[in-house]
């Protein structure tokens, strides 16, 4: 269970996101406290059976001068390990050993004509870039501290077509009234997330797909991607799908 500025948030209640924390800009976090065991259950009930993470966001402070801060970072990610698979020549050699009496055409799955050498893992994986930008404005006007923050994060995945974008807005204002007898704290945090999770089935397909086949086929009716087809033009149902097409 996460509690952000006193508001309990269950991870399970946010569909399509990596978790509750993915909606919050790291630059907005002031403190991070973990409660566990009986203390968490006593306060938050059964929802806290696995512990509670208390998060408070930053706020303006009385006496602080106006301050504008920008923070940015850029990241590069690269895949480091791939499955060792057969290249085209090795694949053809093994096909001749395993199926010496079957030559392309009689079975589409054994067709090794128009030989190319496609490394399917290299086709679906690649270097990716990420960048984060954070703008914070804070200060105080007499007895009213304030703070406004804007954040933007963009992350491409090492699996092609994977992408995550997040826009965040945070604000807080805490006026003190009636000769310091009344203090009001108003704060809010909002986020807009736009993500695309690529089909993970393409990863397994890339380790199994025929390396003698090309990624693209100009005559293919399926988006121009090469595919196993029957004589009538329908896909071969038992064949592994083109990994790139799955993305």
Regions found by a protein language model. Name each.
Residues 7-36:
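Short acidic/polar hinge/loop motifs at secondary-structure boundaries
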Residues 62-117, 158-159, 168, 172-247:
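Surface-exposed loop/interface segments of Gram-negative outer-membrane beta-barrel transport/assembly proteins
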Residues 26-69, 130-132, 151-156:
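A beta-strand signature from Gram-negative outer-membrane beta-barrel systems
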Residues 35, 56-58, 136-140, 149, ...:
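Transmembrane beta-barrel domains of outer membrane proteins
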């Amino acid at each position: 269970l996460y509690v952000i500025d006193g508001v309990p948030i269950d991870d399970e209640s946010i569909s399509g996101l990596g978790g509750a924390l993915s909606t919050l800009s790291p630059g907005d976090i002031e403190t991070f406290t973990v409660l566990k065991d009986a203390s968490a259950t006593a306060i938050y009930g059964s929802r806290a059976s696995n512990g509670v993470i208390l998060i408070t966001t930053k706020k303006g402070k009385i006496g602080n001068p106006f301050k504008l801060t920008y923070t940015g970072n850029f990241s590069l990610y690269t895949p480091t390990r791939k499955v060792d698979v057969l290249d085209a020549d090795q694949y053809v050699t093994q096909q001749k050993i395993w199926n010496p009496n079957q030559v392309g055409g009689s079975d589409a799955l054994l067709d090794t004509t128009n030989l190319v050498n496609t490394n399917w893992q290299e086709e679906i994986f690649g270097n990716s870039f990420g960048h984060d930008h954070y703008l914070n404005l804070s200060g105080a006007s007499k007895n009213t501290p304030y703070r406004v923050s804007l954040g933007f994060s963009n992350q491409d995945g090492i699996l092609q077509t994977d992408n995550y974008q997040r826009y965040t807005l945070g604000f807080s204002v805490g006026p003190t009234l009636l000769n310091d007898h009344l203090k009001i704290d108003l704060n809010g945090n909002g986020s807009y997330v736009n993500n695309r999770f690529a089909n993970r089935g393409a990863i397994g397909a890339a380790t199994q797909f025929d390396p003698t086949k090309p990624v693209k086929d100009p005559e293919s009716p399926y988006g121009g991607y090469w595919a196993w087809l029957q004589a009538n033009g329908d896909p071969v149902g038992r064949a592994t799908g083109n990994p790139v097409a799955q993305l």
